[in-house]
Protein backbone atom coordinates (compact mmCIF):
# COMPACT_ATOMS: atom_id res chain seq x y z
CA UNK A 1 0.00 0.00 0.00
CA UNK A 2 1.50 3.31 -1.11
CA UNK A 3 1.28 6.54 0.87
CA UNK A 4 -1.71 8.01 -1.03
CA UNK A 5 -3.73 4.82 -0.65
CA UNK A 6 -2.90 4.68 3.04
CA UNK A 7 -4.17 8.25 3.53
CA UNK A 8 -7.43 7.48 1.68
CA UNK A 9 -8.03 4.30 3.68
CA UNK A 10 -7.39 6.17 6.95
CA UNK A 11 -9.92 8.83 5.94
CA UNK A 12 -12.46 6.14 5.08
CA UNK A 13 -11.93 4.38 8.43
CA UNK A 14 -12.22 7.62 10.41
CA UNK A 15 -15.51 8.49 8.69
CA UNK A 16 -16.77 4.93 9.17
CA UNK A 17 -16.09 5.11 12.92
CA UNK A 18 -18.39 8.14 13.13
CA UNK A 19 -21.30 6.03 11.84
CA UNK A 20 -22.77 5.41 15.30
CA UNK A 21 -26.30 6.41 14.22
CA UNK A 22 -28.37 6.36 11.04
CA UNK A 23 -26.76 9.34 9.28
CA UNK A 24 -27.44 9.87 5.59
CA UNK A 25 -24.59 12.43 5.13
CA UNK A 26 -22.00 10.01 6.53
CA UNK A 27 -23.28 7.12 4.37
CA UNK A 28 -23.29 9.40 1.30
CA UNK A 29 -19.69 10.47 2.00
CA UNK A 30 -18.59 6.84 2.31
CA UNK A 31 -20.34 5.99 -0.96
CA UNK A 32 -18.61 8.85 -2.79
CA UNK A 33 -15.21 7.80 -1.45
CA UNK A 34 -15.84 4.23 -2.57
CA UNK A 35 -16.93 5.40 -6.02
CA UNK A 36 -13.96 7.74 -6.51
CA UNK A 37 -11.34 5.26 -5.28
CA UNK A 38 -12.25 1.89 -6.79
CA UNK A 39 -8.60 0.87 -6.65
CA UNK A 40 -8.97 0.77 -2.85
CA UNK A 41 -12.14 -1.38 -3.01
CA UNK A 42 -10.65 -4.36 -1.19
CA UNK A 43 -9.45 -2.15 1.69
CA UNK A 44 -12.87 -0.50 1.96
CA UNK A 45 -14.63 -3.89 2.01
CA UNK A 46 -12.29 -5.15 4.74
CA UNK A 47 -12.93 -2.00 6.79
CA UNK A 48 -16.74 -2.33 6.57
CA UNK A 49 -16.66 -6.06 7.40
CA UNK A 50 -14.38 -5.38 10.37
CA UNK A 51 -16.73 -2.61 11.50
CA UNK A 52 -19.74 -4.96 11.36
CA UNK A 53 -17.87 -7.63 13.31
CA UNK A 54 -16.47 -5.41 16.08
CA UNK A 55 -19.00 -2.62 16.66
CA UNK A 56 -21.87 -2.66 19.15
CA UNK A 57 -25.02 -4.60 18.18
CA UNK A 58 -27.01 -1.35 18.01
CA UNK A 59 -24.58 0.06 15.40
CA UNK A 60 -24.26 -3.00 13.13
CA UNK A 61 -27.35 -2.07 11.11
CA UNK A 62 -25.87 1.32 10.12
CA UNK A 63 -22.73 -0.37 8.74
CA UNK A 64 -25.03 -2.65 6.70
CA UNK A 65 -26.75 0.47 5.36
CA UNK A 66 -23.34 1.75 4.19
CA UNK A 67 -22.65 -1.64 2.55
CA UNK A 68 -26.07 -1.53 0.84
CA UNK A 69 -25.55 2.04 -0.42
CA UNK A 70 -22.09 1.32 -1.87
CA UNK A 71 -23.22 -1.85 -3.64
CA UNK A 72 -26.37 -0.26 -5.10
CA UNK A 73 -24.72 2.97 -6.28
CA UNK A 74 -21.28 1.70 -7.33
CA UNK A 75 -21.85 -1.98 -8.08
CA UNK A 76 -18.89 -4.10 -9.16
CA UNK A 77 -16.33 -4.92 -7.78
CA UNK A 78 -17.90 -4.22 -4.37
CA UNK A 79 -20.78 -6.65 -4.93
CA UNK A 80 -18.31 -9.42 -5.73
CA UNK A 81 -16.10 -8.73 -2.71
CA UNK A 82 -19.01 -8.47 -0.27
CA UNK A 83 -20.70 -11.66 -1.61
CA UNK A 84 -17.80 -13.81 -0.34
CA UNK A 85 -18.55 -13.24 3.36
CA UNK A 86 -22.09 -11.82 3.20
CA UNK A 87 -23.88 -14.86 4.66
CA UNK A 88 -21.63 -15.09 7.74
CA UNK A 89 -21.91 -11.36 8.42
CA UNK A 90 -25.68 -11.38 8.05
CA UNK A 91 -26.14 -14.49 10.20
CA UNK A 92 -23.97 -13.26 13.10
CA UNK A 93 -25.61 -9.85 13.06
CA UNK A 94 -29.12 -11.33 12.99
CA UNK A 95 -28.40 -13.50 16.03
CA UNK A 96 -27.05 -10.55 18.07
CA UNK A 97 -29.55 -7.77 17.44
CA UNK A 98 -33.06 -7.24 18.83
CA UNK A 99 -36.35 -8.00 17.07
CA UNK A 100 -36.80 -4.47 15.69
CA UNK A 101 -33.38 -4.54 14.03
CA UNK A 102 -34.07 -8.05 12.74
CA UNK A 103 -37.19 -6.78 11.01
CA UNK A 104 -35.14 -4.05 9.30
CA UNK A 105 -32.52 -6.60 8.24
CA UNK A 106 -35.25 -8.77 6.70
CA UNK A 107 -36.68 -5.78 4.80
CA UNK A 108 -33.19 -4.95 3.49
CA UNK A 109 -32.71 -8.57 2.37
CA UNK A 110 -36.02 -8.45 0.44
CA UNK A 111 -34.67 -5.45 -1.49
CA UNK A 112 -31.52 -7.40 -2.33
CA UNK A 113 -33.66 -10.05 -4.04
CA UNK A 114 -35.13 -7.51 -6.45
CA UNK A 115 -33.30 -7.56 -9.83
CA UNK A 116 -31.23 -4.52 -10.76
CA UNK A 117 -30.75 -2.92 -14.21
CA UNK A 118 -28.99 -6.01 -15.53
CA UNK A 119 -31.90 -8.25 -14.48
CA UNK A 120 -29.84 -10.02 -11.81
CA UNK A 121 -29.97 -9.79 -8.01
CA UNK A 122 -27.63 -7.40 -6.23
CA UNK A 123 -25.33 -10.13 -4.83
CA UNK A 124 -24.41 -13.66 -5.88
CA UNK A 125 -27.28 -16.14 -5.89
CA UNK A 126 -25.55 -18.66 -3.59
CA UNK A 127 -25.08 -16.09 -0.80
CA UNK A 128 -28.69 -14.90 -1.08
CA UNK A 129 -29.99 -18.50 -1.04
CA UNK A 130 -28.10 -19.27 2.18
CA UNK A 131 -29.50 -16.14 3.82
CA UNK A 132 -33.04 -17.04 2.70
CA UNK A 133 -32.82 -20.57 4.11
CA UNK A 134 -31.41 -19.21 7.35
CA UNK A 135 -34.26 -16.69 7.69
CA UNK A 136 -36.88 -19.39 7.06
CA UNK A 137 -35.46 -21.58 9.80
CA UNK A 138 -34.96 -18.64 12.17
CA UNK A 139 -38.49 -17.32 11.65
CA UNK A 140 -40.00 -20.79 12.19
CA UNK A 141 -37.94 -21.26 15.35
CA UNK A 142 -38.83 -17.79 16.53
CA UNK A 143 -42.50 -18.50 15.89
CA UNK A 144 -42.33 -21.70 17.93
CA UNK A 145 -40.49 -20.01 20.77
CA UNK A 146 -42.93 -17.14 20.75
CA UNK A 147 -45.91 -19.48 20.87
CA UNK A 148 -44.30 -21.43 23.70
CA UNK A 149 -43.59 -18.26 25.65
CA UNK A 150 -47.07 -16.85 25.22
CA UNK A 151 -49.63 -17.72 27.88
CA UNK A 152 -52.53 -20.00 27.05
CA UNK A 153 -55.04 -17.81 25.22
CA UNK A 154 -58.38 -17.26 26.92
CA UNK A 155 -61.26 -15.00 26.04
CA UNK A 156 -60.67 -12.53 28.94
CA UNK A 157 -56.95 -12.31 28.07
CA UNK A 158 -57.69 -11.60 24.41
CA UNK A 159 -60.30 -9.02 25.38
CA UNK A 160 -57.67 -7.18 27.44
CA UNK A 161 -55.26 -7.24 24.46
CA UNK A 162 -58.01 -5.83 22.25
CA UNK A 163 -58.63 -3.04 24.77
CA UNK A 164 -54.91 -2.15 24.75
CA UNK A 165 -54.86 -2.02 20.95
CA UNK A 166 -58.01 0.09 20.96
CA UNK A 167 -56.36 2.61 23.29
CA UNK A 168 -53.23 2.80 21.13
CA UNK A 169 -55.26 3.22 17.95
CA UNK A 170 -57.43 5.91 19.56
CA UNK A 171 -54.31 7.85 20.57
CA UNK A 172 -53.02 7.67 17.01
CA UNK A 173 -56.43 8.72 15.69
CA UNK A 174 -56.33 11.89 17.83
CA UNK A 175 -53.19 13.00 16.00
CA UNK A 176 -54.46 11.79 12.61
CA UNK A 177 -58.25 12.33 12.61
CA UNK A 178 -58.56 11.88 8.82
CA UNK A 179 -56.83 8.49 8.64
CA UNK A 180 -59.38 6.01 7.26
CA UNK A 181 -57.20 2.98 8.03
CA UNK A 182 -57.21 3.76 11.73
CA UNK A 183 -60.99 4.16 11.73
CA UNK A 184 -61.36 0.82 9.95
CA UNK A 185 -58.97 -0.76 12.45
CA UNK A 186 -61.09 0.44 15.39
CA UNK A 187 -64.19 -0.98 13.72
CA UNK A 188 -62.52 -4.38 13.17
CA UNK A 189 -61.33 -4.51 16.77
CA UNK A 190 -64.82 -3.78 18.09
CA UNK A 191 -66.32 -6.49 15.85
CA UNK A 192 -63.66 -8.98 16.96
CA UNK A 193 -64.43 -8.17 20.58
CA UNK A 194 -68.13 -8.83 20.03
CA UNK A 195 -67.42 -12.13 18.25
CA UNK A 196 -65.23 -13.33 21.11
CA UNK A 197 -68.02 -12.57 23.56
CA UNK A 198 -70.66 -14.36 21.51
CA UNK A 199 -69.07 -17.57 20.18
CA UNK A 200 -66.90 -20.22 21.80
CA UNK A 201 -63.78 -20.64 19.64
CA UNK A 202 -61.37 -23.54 19.68
CA UNK A 203 -57.92 -23.30 21.25
CA UNK A 204 -56.18 -23.15 17.86
CA UNK A 205 -58.42 -20.30 16.74
CA UNK A 206 -57.70 -18.42 19.95
CA UNK A 207 -53.95 -18.90 19.38
CA UNK A 208 -54.22 -17.49 15.86
CA UNK A 209 -56.12 -14.47 17.16
CA UNK A 210 -53.48 -14.00 19.86
CA UNK A 211 -50.60 -14.08 17.34
CA UNK A 212 -52.34 -11.59 15.06
CA UNK A 213 -52.99 -9.24 17.96
CA UNK A 214 -49.33 -9.48 18.98
CA UNK A 215 -48.18 -8.58 15.46
CA UNK A 216 -50.52 -5.60 15.27
CA UNK A 217 -49.44 -4.46 18.73
CA UNK A 218 -45.73 -4.59 17.80
CA UNK A 219 -46.42 -2.59 14.62
CA UNK A 220 -48.26 0.10 16.58
CA UNK A 221 -45.45 0.30 19.11
CA UNK A 222 -42.92 0.71 16.30
CA UNK A 223 -44.97 3.54 14.80
CA UNK A 224 -45.17 5.30 18.17
CA UNK A 225 -41.41 4.96 18.70
CA UNK A 226 -40.70 6.45 15.28
CA UNK A 227 -43.06 9.32 16.05
CA UNK A 228 -41.28 9.98 19.35
CA UNK A 229 -37.93 10.03 17.55
CA UNK A 230 -39.38 12.45 15.00
CA UNK A 231 -40.58 14.78 17.77
CA UNK A 232 -37.16 14.62 19.44
CA UNK A 233 -35.47 15.55 16.16
CA UNK A 234 -37.89 18.44 15.73
CA UNK A 235 -37.11 19.71 19.23
CA UNK A 236 -33.38 19.50 18.53
CA UNK A 237 -33.85 21.41 15.28
CA UNK A 238 -35.88 24.08 17.08
CA UNK A 239 -33.18 24.47 19.70
CA UNK A 240 -30.54 24.81 16.99
CA UNK A 241 -32.67 27.42 15.21
CA UNK A 242 -33.08 29.37 18.44
CA UNK A 243 -29.34 29.31 19.03
CA UNK A 244 -28.71 30.50 15.48
CA UNK A 245 -31.24 33.31 15.92
CA UNK A 246 -29.55 34.40 19.15
CA UNK A 247 -26.17 34.42 17.42
CA UNK A 248 -27.60 36.45 14.55
CA UNK A 249 -29.11 38.96 16.98
CA UNK A 250 -25.78 39.31 18.77
CA UNK A 251 -24.01 39.82 15.46
CA UNK A 252 -26.57 42.46 14.45
CA UNK A 253 -26.04 44.29 17.75
CA UNK A 254 -22.31 44.13 17.20
CA UNK A 255 -22.59 45.53 13.67
CA UNK A 256 -24.93 48.29 14.85
CA UNK A 257 -22.49 49.38 17.56
CA UNK A 258 -19.64 49.21 15.06
CA UNK A 259 -21.59 51.34 12.55
CA UNK A 260 -22.36 53.88 15.27
CA UNK A 261 -18.69 54.09 16.18
CA UNK A 262 -17.74 54.41 12.51
CA UNK A 263 -20.26 57.20 11.92
CA UNK A 264 -18.99 59.00 15.02
CA UNK A 265 -15.40 58.81 13.83
CA UNK A 266 -16.42 60.01 10.35
CA UNK A 267 -18.27 62.98 11.80
CA UNK A 268 -15.31 63.84 14.00
CA UNK A 269 -12.96 63.55 11.02
CA UNK A 270 -15.12 65.78 8.85
CA UNK A 271 -15.37 68.51 11.49
CA UNK A 272 -13.79 71.85 10.49
CA UNK A 273 -10.84 72.69 12.74
CA UNK A 274 -10.80 76.05 14.46
CA UNK A 275 -7.03 76.43 14.46
CA UNK A 276 -4.60 75.18 11.85
CA UNK A 277 -4.64 71.99 9.84
CA UNK A 278 -6.57 69.03 11.09
CA UNK A 279 -4.41 66.35 9.51
CA UNK A 280 -2.59 65.54 12.75
CA UNK A 281 -5.77 65.34 14.72
CA UNK A 282 -7.42 63.11 12.13
CA UNK A 283 -4.45 60.77 12.16
CA UNK A 284 -4.55 60.60 15.92
CA UNK A 285 -8.29 59.95 15.88
CA UNK A 286 -7.95 57.28 13.23
CA UNK A 287 -5.20 55.54 15.17
CA UNK A 288 -7.26 55.83 18.34
CA UNK A 289 -10.37 54.41 16.72
CA UNK A 290 -8.41 51.59 15.11
CA UNK A 291 -6.74 50.74 18.39
CA UNK A 292 -10.05 50.80 20.27
CA UNK A 293 -12.33 49.06 17.81
CA UNK A 294 -10.11 47.40 15.23
CA UNK A 295 -9.22 44.30 17.26
CA UNK A 296 -12.70 43.31 18.42
CA UNK A 297 -12.94 39.56 17.85
CA UNK A 298 -16.27 38.71 19.42
CA UNK A 299 -19.50 40.13 20.73
CA UNK A 300 -19.46 41.14 24.38
CA UNK A 301 -22.44 40.41 26.56
CA UNK A 302 -24.40 43.07 28.40
CA UNK A 303 -23.01 41.95 31.76
CA UNK A 304 -19.42 42.29 30.56
CA UNK A 305 -20.11 45.79 29.25
CA UNK A 306 -21.65 46.83 32.59
CA UNK A 307 -18.74 45.31 34.47
CA UNK A 308 -16.23 47.24 32.38
CA UNK A 309 -18.17 50.46 32.93
CA UNK A 310 -18.14 50.02 36.71
CA UNK A 311 -14.42 49.16 36.67
CA UNK A 312 -13.67 52.25 34.61
CA UNK A 313 -15.58 54.41 37.08
CA UNK A 314 -13.65 52.95 40.00
CA UNK A 315 -10.31 53.41 38.23
CA UNK A 316 -11.14 57.00 37.33
CA UNK A 317 -12.18 57.74 40.91
CA UNK A 318 -8.99 56.17 42.25
CA UNK A 319 -6.84 58.12 39.80
CA UNK A 320 -8.51 61.42 40.72
CA UNK A 321 -8.15 60.77 44.46
CA UNK A 322 -4.52 59.79 44.01
CA UNK A 323 -3.86 62.93 41.97
CA UNK A 324 -5.28 65.05 44.79
CA UNK A 325 -3.02 63.30 47.31
CA UNK A 326 -5.91 61.79 49.27
CA UNK A 327 -4.67 58.19 48.97
CA UNK A 328 -1.75 57.02 51.04
CA UNK A 329 0.94 55.25 49.05
CA UNK A 330 2.84 52.72 51.19
CA UNK A 331 6.63 52.73 51.07
CA UNK A 332 8.58 50.22 49.07
CA UNK A 333 9.46 47.91 51.96
CA UNK A 334 6.10 48.02 53.78
CA UNK A 335 4.04 44.95 54.62
CA UNK A 336 1.37 46.05 52.14
CA UNK A 337 3.89 46.13 49.30
CA UNK A 338 5.28 42.76 50.34
CA UNK A 339 1.77 41.30 50.45
CA UNK A 340 0.99 42.55 46.95
CA UNK A 341 4.29 41.24 45.61
CA UNK A 342 3.70 37.81 47.09
CA UNK A 343 0.20 37.72 45.62
CA UNK A 344 1.56 38.58 42.17
CA UNK A 345 0.01 42.05 41.87
CA UNK A 346 0.42 43.48 38.39
CA UNK A 347 1.71 46.88 39.56
CA UNK A 348 4.66 45.36 41.43
CA UNK A 349 7.40 43.64 39.46
CA UNK A 350 9.97 41.45 41.20
CA UNK A 351 13.66 41.38 40.40
CA UNK A 352 15.74 38.20 40.57
CA UNK A 353 16.83 38.79 44.18
CA UNK A 354 13.24 39.34 45.35
CA UNK A 355 12.06 36.25 43.48
CA UNK A 356 14.71 34.19 45.24
CA UNK A 357 13.61 35.61 48.60
CA UNK A 358 9.99 34.90 47.76
CA UNK A 359 10.79 31.21 47.23
CA UNK A 360 12.11 30.98 50.78
CA UNK A 361 9.06 32.69 52.30
CA UNK A 362 6.04 30.68 53.45
CA UNK A 363 2.70 30.85 51.69
CA UNK A 364 0.30 33.76 52.20
CA UNK A 365 -2.40 31.71 54.03
CA UNK A 366 0.20 30.51 56.54
CA UNK A 367 1.41 34.07 57.11
CA UNK A 368 -2.19 35.17 57.67
CA UNK A 369 -2.65 32.42 60.25
CA UNK A 370 0.54 33.45 62.05
CA UNK A 371 -0.60 37.09 62.09
CA UNK A 372 -4.01 36.12 63.47
CA UNK A 373 -2.39 33.97 66.16
CA UNK A 374 -0.21 36.93 67.19
CA UNK A 375 -3.27 39.16 67.40
CA UNK A 376 -5.04 36.57 69.52
CA UNK A 377 -2.05 36.21 71.83
CA UNK A 378 -1.67 39.95 72.39
CA UNK A 379 -5.42 40.49 72.61
CA UNK A 380 -5.53 40.15 76.39
CA UNK A 381 -2.28 41.98 77.14
CA UNK A 382 -2.92 44.64 79.82
CA UNK A 383 -6.56 43.51 80.01
CA UNK A 384 -7.91 41.98 83.20
CA UNK A 385 -10.73 39.94 81.74
CA UNK A 386 -12.31 39.06 85.09
CA UNK A 387 -12.22 42.52 86.72
CA UNK A 388 -12.53 44.85 83.75
CA UNK A 389 -15.51 47.22 84.26
CA UNK A 390 -16.20 47.41 80.52
CA UNK A 391 -16.81 43.66 80.46
CA UNK A 392 -19.36 43.58 83.24
CA UNK A 393 -22.84 42.49 82.22
CA UNK A 394 -24.91 45.66 82.34
CA UNK A 395 -27.33 47.56 80.15
CA UNK A 396 -24.73 50.18 79.31
CA UNK A 397 -22.11 47.72 78.08
CA UNK A 398 -24.71 45.85 76.04
CA UNK A 399 -26.26 48.84 74.27
CA UNK A 400 -23.13 50.93 73.68
CA UNK A 401 -20.12 50.05 71.56
CA UNK A 402 -17.45 48.09 73.39
CA UNK A 403 -14.02 48.60 71.75
CA UNK A 404 -12.26 46.08 73.98
CA UNK A 405 -14.61 43.31 72.88
CA UNK A 406 -14.64 44.35 69.22
CA UNK A 407 -10.92 45.03 68.80
CA UNK A 408 -9.30 42.55 71.19
CA UNK A 409 -11.38 39.76 72.58
CA UNK A 410 -13.07 38.74 69.32
CA UNK A 411 -9.62 37.79 67.97
CA UNK A 412 -8.99 35.79 71.11
CA UNK A 413 -12.35 34.01 70.82
CA UNK A 414 -12.05 32.93 67.21
CA UNK A 415 -8.33 32.17 67.17
CA UNK A 416 -7.89 30.42 70.51
CA UNK A 417 -11.03 28.32 69.95
CA UNK A 418 -11.36 27.92 66.16
CA UNK A 419 -13.36 24.68 66.17
CA UNK A 420 -17.07 25.41 66.32
CA UNK A 421 -19.87 22.94 67.06
CA UNK A 422 -22.18 22.90 64.06
CA UNK A 423 -25.23 22.21 66.24
CA UNK A 424 -25.08 24.71 69.11
CA UNK A 425 -22.09 26.93 68.24
CA UNK A 426 -19.93 26.08 71.24
CA UNK A 427 -16.21 26.55 70.49
CA UNK A 428 -13.19 24.36 71.24
CA UNK A 429 -9.44 24.74 70.84
CA UNK A 430 -6.88 22.69 68.91
CA UNK A 431 -5.20 20.98 71.86
CA UNK A 432 -5.70 17.30 72.59
CA UNK A 433 -7.77 17.99 75.68
CA UNK A 434 -10.00 20.42 73.76
CA UNK A 435 -10.48 17.88 70.96
CA UNK A 436 -11.46 15.28 73.55
CA UNK A 437 -13.98 17.70 75.03
CA UNK A 438 -15.36 18.37 71.55
CA UNK A 439 -15.81 14.64 70.91
CA UNK A 440 -17.63 14.25 74.23
CA UNK A 441 -19.79 17.25 73.38
CA UNK A 442 -20.75 15.70 70.02
CA UNK A 443 -21.55 12.41 71.77
CA UNK A 444 -23.84 14.32 74.09
CA UNK A 445 -25.64 15.85 71.09
CA UNK A 446 -26.02 12.37 69.62
CA UNK A 447 -27.63 11.07 72.81
CA UNK A 448 -30.00 14.03 72.99
CA UNK A 449 -31.00 13.66 69.31
CA UNK A 450 -31.57 9.95 69.83
CA UNK A 451 -33.95 10.72 72.67
CA UNK A 452 -35.77 13.41 70.71
CA UNK A 453 -36.13 11.48 67.46
CA UNK A 454 -36.49 8.01 68.92
CA UNK A 455 -37.17 4.76 67.13
CA UNK A 456 -40.20 3.50 69.03
CA UNK A 457 -43.84 4.29 68.43
CA UNK A 458 -45.17 6.64 71.08
CA UNK A 459 -48.64 7.89 71.73
CA UNK A 460 -50.36 11.12 72.53
CA UNK A 461 -53.25 9.94 74.58
CA UNK A 462 -56.46 11.87 75.03
CA UNK A 463 -59.36 10.65 77.11
CA UNK A 464 -62.88 11.89 76.64
CA UNK A 465 -65.46 10.31 78.98
CA UNK A 466 -64.52 6.62 78.97
CA UNK A 467 -63.19 6.41 75.40
CA UNK A 468 -59.42 6.12 74.75
CA UNK A 469 -58.23 7.89 71.58
CA UNK A 470 -54.60 7.27 70.60
CA UNK A 471 -52.62 8.81 67.76
CA UNK A 472 -49.37 7.08 66.90
CA UNK A 473 -46.36 9.26 66.13
CA UNK A 474 -42.69 8.67 65.50
CA UNK A 475 -41.34 11.30 67.91
CA UNK A 476 -40.67 10.53 71.55
CA UNK A 477 -42.25 12.54 74.31
CA UNK A 478 -39.99 15.06 76.06
CA UNK A 479 -40.87 15.53 79.74
CA UNK A 480 -38.51 18.02 81.37
CA UNK A 481 -38.39 21.45 83.00
CA UNK A 482 -37.42 24.24 80.63
CA UNK A 483 -35.65 26.43 83.18
CA UNK A 484 -33.51 25.76 86.23
CA UNK A 485 -33.90 27.59 89.50
CA UNK A 486 -31.37 30.27 90.49
CA UNK A 487 -29.40 28.02 92.81
CA UNK A 488 -29.40 25.14 90.32
CA UNK A 489 -28.29 27.42 87.50
CA UNK A 490 -25.41 28.80 89.60
CA UNK A 491 -24.21 25.29 90.47
CA UNK A 492 -24.79 23.91 86.97
CA UNK A 493 -21.78 22.65 84.97
CA UNK A 494 -21.88 21.68 81.30
CA UNK A 495 -19.23 19.00 81.66
CA UNK A 496 -21.42 17.01 84.03
CA UNK A 497 -23.92 16.29 81.26
CA UNK A 498 -21.70 16.43 78.16
CA UNK A 499 -18.82 14.30 79.40
CA UNK A 500 -18.78 10.55 78.94
CA UNK A 501 -16.25 9.99 81.73
CA UNK A 502 -18.74 10.37 84.57
CA UNK A 503 -20.11 7.17 85.92
CA UNK A 504 -23.47 8.69 86.76
CA UNK A 505 -24.63 8.59 83.13
CA UNK A 506 -28.15 8.45 81.84
CA UNK A 507 -27.74 4.99 80.45
CA UNK A 508 -26.78 3.53 83.85
CA UNK A 509 -29.97 2.27 85.49
CA UNK A 510 -28.15 1.41 88.73
CA UNK A 511 -27.21 5.04 89.51
CA UNK A 512 -30.46 5.69 91.36
CA UNK A 513 -29.76 4.64 94.93
CA UNK A 514 -33.08 5.85 96.30
CA UNK A 515 -35.11 3.25 94.43
CA UNK A 516 -35.10 -0.17 96.00
CA UNK A 517 -34.35 -3.41 94.22
CA UNK A 518 -38.00 -4.29 93.78
CA UNK A 519 -38.50 -1.10 91.68
CA UNK A 520 -35.48 -1.79 89.42
CA UNK A 521 -36.22 -5.45 88.94
CA UNK A 522 -39.35 -4.77 86.95
CA UNK A 523 -39.57 -8.17 85.35
CA UNK A 524 -39.37 -10.18 88.59
CA UNK A 525 -42.09 -12.73 89.07
CA UNK A 526 -44.50 -11.98 91.86
CA UNK A 527 -46.60 -15.08 91.61
CA UNK A 528 -46.50 -15.62 95.31
CA UNK A 529 -49.60 -13.88 96.63
CA UNK A 530 -48.32 -13.66 100.18
CA UNK A 531 -45.06 -11.95 99.19
CA UNK A 532 -46.95 -9.25 97.26
CA UNK A 533 -49.24 -8.61 100.21
CA UNK A 534 -46.31 -8.46 102.63
CA UNK A 535 -44.38 -6.06 100.36
CA UNK A 536 -47.20 -3.65 99.59
CA UNK A 537 -49.05 -4.01 102.85
CA UNK A 538 -46.14 -3.45 105.17
CA UNK A 539 -46.66 -0.74 107.70
CA UNK A 540 -43.14 0.57 107.14
CA UNK A 541 -43.82 1.43 103.44
CA UNK A 542 -44.71 5.04 103.00
CA UNK A 543 -46.39 6.81 100.15
CA UNK A 544 -43.17 8.17 98.61
CA UNK A 545 -41.62 4.74 98.30
CA UNK A 546 -44.79 3.39 96.71
CA UNK A 547 -45.06 6.23 94.22
CA UNK A 548 -41.36 5.86 93.35
CA UNK A 549 -41.92 2.44 91.79
CA UNK A 550 -41.92 2.28 88.02
CA UNK A 551 -41.94 -0.22 85.16
CA UNK A 552 -39.98 0.10 81.93
CA UNK A 553 -42.36 0.25 78.97
CA UNK A 554 -42.16 -3.14 77.23
CA UNK A 555 -41.17 -3.31 73.58
CA UNK A 556 -44.46 -4.98 72.69
CA UNK A 557 -46.43 -1.89 73.71
CA UNK A 558 -47.38 0.04 70.60
CA UNK A 559 -49.07 3.11 72.11
CA UNK A 560 -46.97 3.28 75.32
CA UNK A 561 -50.13 3.46 77.43
CA UNK A 562 -52.26 1.15 79.59
CA UNK A 563 -55.40 1.45 81.70
CA UNK A 564 -55.19 0.64 85.41
CA UNK A 565 -57.75 -2.13 86.11
CA UNK A 566 -58.52 -0.67 89.54
CA UNK A 567 -59.06 3.07 88.96
CA UNK A 568 -59.57 2.87 85.16
CA UNK A 569 -57.11 5.72 84.65
CA UNK A 570 -54.85 5.69 81.57
CA UNK A 571 -51.10 5.77 82.24
CA UNK A 572 -48.76 7.06 79.51
CA UNK A 573 -44.99 6.62 79.22
CA UNK A 574 -42.52 9.30 80.26
CA UNK A 575 -38.78 9.45 79.72
CA UNK A 576 -36.69 8.83 82.84
CA UNK A 577 -33.46 10.83 82.73
CA UNK A 578 -31.68 8.70 85.34
CA UNK A 579 -32.31 5.30 83.79
CA UNK A 580 -32.42 6.48 80.18
CA UNK A 581 -35.63 4.50 79.51
CA UNK A 582 -39.29 5.15 78.83
CA UNK A 583 -41.17 4.15 81.99
CA UNK A 584 -44.63 3.99 83.50
CA UNK A 585 -44.30 5.77 86.83
CA UNK A 586 -46.23 4.73 89.94
CA UNK A 587 -46.68 1.28 88.35
CA UNK A 588 -46.06 -2.35 89.26
CA UNK A 589 -46.43 -5.57 87.28
CA UNK A 590 -48.26 -8.57 88.75
CA UNK A 591 -48.68 -11.75 86.69
CA UNK A 592 -48.36 -9.84 83.42
CA UNK A 593 -50.87 -7.16 84.51
CA UNK A 594 -49.95 -3.53 85.21
CA UNK A 595 -51.44 -1.53 88.12
CA UNK A 596 -50.95 1.79 89.81
CA UNK A 597 -48.73 0.89 92.76
CA UNK A 598 -50.80 3.18 95.01
CA UNK A 599 -54.07 1.62 93.83
CA UNK A 600 -52.75 -1.89 94.36
CA UNK A 601 -51.40 -0.96 97.80
CA UNK A 602 -54.70 0.62 98.93
CA UNK A 603 -56.75 -2.29 97.60
CA UNK A 604 -54.56 -4.87 99.32
CA UNK A 605 -54.67 -2.91 102.61
CA UNK A 606 -58.44 -2.56 102.48
CA UNK A 607 -58.87 -6.24 101.70
CA UNK A 608 -56.58 -7.29 104.60
CA UNK A 609 -58.34 -5.01 107.14
CA UNK A 610 -61.82 -5.95 106.03
CA UNK A 611 -63.83 -8.46 107.98
CA UNK A 612 -64.43 -10.44 104.86
CA UNK A 613 -60.76 -10.71 103.96
CA UNK A 614 -61.21 -13.75 101.76
CA UNK A 615 -63.76 -11.98 99.63
CA UNK A 616 -61.40 -8.99 99.16
CA UNK A 617 -58.55 -11.25 98.12
CA UNK A 618 -60.82 -13.02 95.69
CA UNK A 619 -61.79 -9.68 94.15
CA UNK A 620 -58.12 -8.75 93.83
CA UNK A 621 -57.41 -12.07 92.15
CA UNK A 622 -60.14 -11.35 89.64
CA UNK A 623 -58.53 -8.01 88.82
CA UNK A 624 -55.17 -9.69 88.29
CA UNK A 625 -56.53 -12.48 86.10
CA UNK A 626 -58.73 -10.25 83.95
Curated annotation (Swiss-Prot):
The keyword RNA-binding applies. It is found in: Nucleus. GO terms for biological process: mRNA 3'-end processing; termination of RNA polymerase II transcription; termination of RNA polymerase II transcription, exosome-dependent; termination of RNA polymerase II transcription, poly(A)-coupled. Residues 4-139 form the CID domain. The keyword Transferase does not apply. GO terms for molecular function: mRNA binding; RNA polymerase II complex binding. Pfam families: CID (PF04818), Pcf11_C (PF21936), Pfc11_Clp1_ID (PF11526), Pfc11_Rna14-15-ID (PF21940). Keywords: mRNA processing, Nucleus, RNA-binding, Transcription, Transcription regulation, Transcription termination. GO terms for cellular component: cytoplasm; cytosol; mRNA cleavage factor complex; nucleus. Residues 1-130 are annotated as: Interaction with RBP1 CTD (CID). Residues 263-286 are annotated as: Disordered. Component of the cleavage factor IA (CFIA) complex, which is involved in the endonucleolytic cleavage during polyadenylation-dependent pre-mRNA 3'-end formation and cooperates with cleavage factor NAB4/CFIB and the cleavage and polyadenylation factor (CPF) complex. Independently involved in RNA polymerase II transcript termination. Binds RNA. Seems to bridge RNA polymerase II and the native transcript and may be involved in dismantling the RNA polymerase II elongation complex. Component of the CFIA complex, which is composed of RNA14, RNA15, PCF11 and CLP1. Interacts with RNA14, RNA15 and RTT103. Interacts directly with the phosphorylated CTD domain of RPB1/RNA polymerase II. Present with 2800 molecules/cell in log phase SD medium. This is Protein PCF11.
